[in-house]
């Protein structure tokens, strides 16, 4: 079934509930049952060093370049954005951009890469081959 999205993100610009925040547990469940698309908002270098298994690299600064890819995505799919964790806002920015494109199911995983590897969840990339 659908993964419950708990909290509502507070947009620092005061735009209210633009995207949801998803917990590590819920992000992992969505990963395991294959319902979510994970988007890595970090740089290509960071992505290649290591990323959540199956995630697609979509750096926030290259968002416009990614529009052809995004326009082909199913709007029914849950999209989960992430970056490095607590010190990184790129996942929130990316989630906000996706919401502006009218993707209805967008969540940002604020714990990000750091929380995911700390939990020992599936990863890919050069770091651990």
Descriptions of predicted regions:
Residues 1-37, 45-49, 129:
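Flexible, polar/low-complexity N-terminal or interdomain linker segments that lie immediately upstream
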Residues 32-38, 53-54, 78, 104-105:
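Short active-site oxyanion
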Residues 43-46, 62-63, 85-89, 112-116, ...:
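Solvent-exposed loop/turn segments at secondary-structure junctions
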Residues 30, 65-76:
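Short amphipathic alpha-helix with an adjacent loop that forms part of the alpha/beta core around
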